[in-house]
Every structure is written in structure tokens, then in C-alpha cells.
Amino acid sequence: MMNTKKLIKMFRKWQQRAALHRKRISFQRPSTRSTTVEKGCFVVYTADNTRFAFPISYLSNSVFQEILEISEEEFGLPTGGPITLPFDSVFLEYLIKLIKRRMDGDTEKALLMSISSARCSLQKQEQSTQQLLVF
């Protein structure tokens, strides 16, 4: 039989070796997407799970502020998760092109009105489907 002190010593030795091996194990990420963002940028996801990184300067754009407010109303504030926009990637790419072109005030107002009217029509559709489900 082995001495208790010897068993404890052997156990601690194996624990140390196991700890060393645990530190060396690195798992490969299954996706090739980068989870890091450049300094001065933030990330949003679209409804179809496409990832977009924007410079923080976009936050001063009124159109971008409006779509973030829509996202907040739709999904709530993210708690530990990414910001998700209720639009698909095609619409967001179109929006980026308009912002990069520095659209004039009339175009910006028209875009804001179309976004807000689409939001209102979506809310009406949701209310009507909720009423249908009740009856």
C-alpha cells in the first residue's frame, strides 16, 4: 500500500501537469469571421445575421440614429449581445451608399419619412395580427 503523503504528492503532481496541458489547448473557431473591431468602430448585425462595422462618426447621422431607435423599439437594448437592426443586408448596404454620398437634406428627409412610415405600417400589421390571434 502507498503512504497517504505519497498519494497526495502524486495527486498534486498530476493536477499541475493537467493544468499545464489545459493552458496549451486552443480551440479553433468554426467561423472565419473576425470578432475584433478596428478602433473607432462599432458592429451591428442585420436581420439576416450579416455583420457590419461602422465608424463611430456614423452615430451623428440622423438616418442612422433613426434606424438605431427602430432597432431599440423592435429588439430592446442589447444586454451582452450585439445590436441587431430589423433590416436586411441589402437595405443597409443601400443606406451606407447614401450616407457615403453625403445626401442632401431633401433626400435625407424623404428617407427618414419612408423609414418611419414603414415602421408605422409594421406596427399596424403587428397589432392587426395580434387582434386576429385573440379572436
Swiss-Prot record:
Localisation per UniProt entry: Cell membrane
Main location: membrane
Pfam family, one: Auxin_inducible
GO terms (BP aspect): auxin-activated signaling pathway
Top-rank taxon: Eukaryota
GO CC term, one of those recorded: nucleolus
Keywords: Auxin signaling pathway, Cell membrane, Developmental protein, Growth regulation, Membrane
InterPro entries: SAUR_fam
Membrane topology: Peripheral membrane protein
PANTHER family per UniProt: AUXIN-RESPONSIVE FAMILY PROTEIN, AUXIN-RESPONSIVE PROTEIN SAUR61-RELATED
Function: May promote auxin-stimulated organ elongation, such as hypocotyls, stamen filaments and petals.
Family the UniProt entry places it in: Belongs to the ARG7 family.
Name listed for the protein in its UniProt record: Auxin-responsive protein SAUR66
Annotated source species: Arabidopsis thaliana (Mouse-ear cress)
The gene coding this protein: SAUR66
